[in-house]
Amino acid sequence: MSAEASGPAAAEAPSLEVAKPSELEPGSAAYGLKPLTTNSKYVKLNVGGSLHYTTLRTLTGQDTRLKAMFSGRAEVLTDAGGWVLIDRSGRHFGTILNYLRDGSVPLPESTRELGELLGEARHYLVQGLIEDCQLALQQKRENVSPLCLIPTVTSPREEQQLLASTSKPVVKLLHNRSNNKYSYTSTSDDNLLKNIELFDKLALRFHGRLLFLKDVLGDEICCWSFYGQGRKIAEVCCTSIVYATEKKQTKVEFPEARIFEETLNILIYETPRGPDPALLEATGGAAGGGGASRGEDEDNREHRVRRIHVRRHITHDERPHGQQIVFKD
């Protein structure tokens, strides 16, 4: 900070200009440090090259590190120009001073600058500003929705890597029309599209809680798989081989209710501890088996996969005359 005399008396008035600390050289007459005078009401601060002129009342009004420095409990040194040197970045020091004066201050919009201001507030122990910055950062995190990214599986190895790299439950849809050997029934194309559309809707709704994968290289035509804590929990296969005419046909179904059920069931695997056994049994994850011991039930549960599969190929001789039959495993 500096001031200069102007007008007719400029030649007679002594200059009030103070040399900046950066202009002071060792060995010069102005070089050297001396204690801050105790009767001064004003303080000149050089914070990392940023110059500030404020009052002792502002610096000591709140219980901060600056109050500890300037309350007289410790000796504060100034250079020959009267500047108190503080070895910190001065970028946000003006905001710190404004908060000490007014008790509030507009916060930066940038998350990066907000984090920098939080760091300076912590250094100077300005508790109110620390809390304001932390709250603003938390609100920014809550307002930013996670991206809806759906990886496409290109190999079994990649699938295992994806399953191992996430802590979220996983929903995978395999759809690969090239696996079909027969003609489709009249509703199969429509049902295949419905499965894909439902997958997209679920991904938009639950992408913050579940990882969704697409598989276009598997050996099924349409199949849903549900994973929790790295292992497969349930599987819903939507294809079957039927006799609608005198030849085999591929039928694609759309078990919407079952898909919704398994998607909601897999959410119980969100916690690192895994699902509660009572909740797992209530959702159909436990076996009946009245004669089995509790330990056997728990061991079986670890390796059991709930499946709805339509796999069996029905020959012409096995089919009752004039009827369409679908066998489910």
UniProtKB/Swiss-Prot annotation:
Protein name, per record: BTB/POZ domain-containing adapter for CUL3-mediated RhoA degradation protein 1
Keyword entries, A-Z: Nucleus, Ubl conjugation pathway
Pathway connected to this protein: Protein modification; protein ubiquitination
GO biological process annotation, one example: protein homooligomerization
Domain BTB residue range list: 41-109
Cellular component per GO, a single term: Cul3-RING ubiquitin ligase complex
One Pfam family matching this protein: BTB_2
Region of interest (Disordered), residue spans: 1-21, 280-302
Subunit structure, as described in the record: Homotetramer; forms a two-fold symmetric tetramer in solution. Interacts with CUL3; interaction is direct and forms a 5:5 heterodecamer. Component of the BCR(KCTD13) E3 ubiquitin ligase complex, at least composed of CUL3, KCTD13/BACURD1 and RBX1. Interacts with RHOA; with a preference for RhoA-GDP. Interacts with POLD2 and PCNA. Interacts with SPRTN.
A molecular function (GO) term: small GTPase binding
Keyword Acetylation: no
Gene: KCTD13
Role of this protein: Substrate-specific adapter of a BCR (BTB-CUL3-RBX1) E3 ubiquitin-protein ligase complex required for synaptic transmission. The BCR(KCTD13) E3 ubiquitin ligase complex mediates the ubiquitination of RHOA, leading to its degradation by the proteasome, thereby regulating the actin cytoskeleton and promoting synaptic transmission.
Family affiliation: Belongs to the BACURD family.
Protein origin, superkingdom: Eukaryota
Compositionally biased residues, Low complexity: 1-15
Location(s), subcellular: Nucleus
